[in-house]
Amino acid sequence: MSLNMFWFLPTHGDGHYLGTEEGSRSVDHGYLQQIAQVADRLGYTGVLIPTGRSCEDAWLVAASMIPVTQRLKFLVALRPSVTSPTVAARQAATLDRLSNGRALFNLVTGSDPQELAGDGVFLDHSERYEASAEFTQVWRRLLLGETVDFNGKHIHVRGAKLLFPPIQQPYPPLYFGGSSDVAQDLAAEQVDLYLTWGEPPELVKEKIAHVRAKAAAHGRKIRFGIRLHVIVRETNDEAWQAAERLISHLDDETIAKAQAAFARTDSVGQQRMAALHNGKRDNLEISPNLWAGVGLVRGGAGTALVGDGPTVAARINEYAALGIDSFVLSGYPHLEEAYRIGELLFPHLDVAIPEIPQPQLLNPQGEAVANDFIPRNVAQS
């Protein structure tokens, strides 16, 4: 099975070390463009663009990268409860059309009560997933070309429709990650690819089995992906030394503050990440070549595969054997590590190199009439 390898645009900052200004670098449009173009040339399928108050806006970043890339896809966040499903569907179709079918979407429900309150969202964990399920139903139906009337607990629309459909049919693929039961239910019912953070293989196997069974109960099959950092070097010793350098400027106070911030979230996935290390710097290799040091201060994906090219490839193939076909990777700094992974890791894997998409000829159309419908030719009698 050929593997889809994604990279990451670090719109929330980048550098040589975690938790310090030492070795940090400015993340401006030029730098992000460099990373995107390297990923495009090296054959990465796409890039994940993060979301939240600590990041630049993912949609604007993605749109700005379209003209400077040829085949790279952009995995952009959908935020239920923050954006209406109709507006989000319109944005999604536009991004897909402008990128010539290179848009992918990542459903993000949010988990930090403080950040959510700042965004005007005051729903608890279960309510957010209810709202996300309703949002996704409306979003998908709109992109499928339906005119939608929907009267749910959280979402209400009447006569919602899109005038301009997406390039990808039936609609651009929808990704989603979540470890709670309600999250897995949502994935099983509505998404195309379920993402997990990089837990040890036995835990990932268990999670995939649960989601696969839930999807089968709905008569569906979904794909699986995993989010990991990678520290790959020419030798295993060099890779482990690089891992230690990455956290060499971290002090206990910074780790404690980060763990306290993570503790206030209601994310089951974040709780599972934190449990892998419990905020302690010792015993960070939690599974062969799987290192939890990143998660001492980084929210979300907190584990890295560490080793030389053949070793890391072997670990990736272990995950692939569980049914994972998409790997969303990152490394510090992201420009250099995109090259390093392409040079040291990719030759040991069956990487699916995307083709440059051919321009899609959109149907010619006149200006929308009364902002309501597209004029069609009327047969002459």
Curated annotation (Swiss-Prot):
The keyword Flavoprotein applies. Signal peptide: none annotated. It catalyses: an alkanesulfonate + FMNH2 + O2 = an aldehyde + FMN + sulfite + H2O + 2 H(+). Its EC number is 1.14.14.5. One of its GO terms (molecular function) is alkanesulfonate monooxygenase activity. It comes from the Bacteria. Pfam families: Bac_luciferase (PF00296). One of its GO terms (biological process) is alkanesulfonate catabolic process. Keywords: Flavoprotein, FMN, Monooxygenase, Oxidoreductase. Belongs to the SsuD family. Catalyzes the desulfonation of aliphatic sulfonates. FMNH(2) which is absolutely required for this enzymatic reaction, is provided by SsuE. Homotetramer. NCBIfam families: alk_sulf_monoox (TIGR03565), PRK00719.1 (NF001939). This is Alkanesulfonate monooxygenase. It comes from Escherichia fergusonii (strain ATCC 35469 / DSM 13698 / CCUG 18766 / IAM 14443 / JCM 21226 / LMG 7866 / NBRC 102419 / NCTC 12128 / CDC 0568-73).
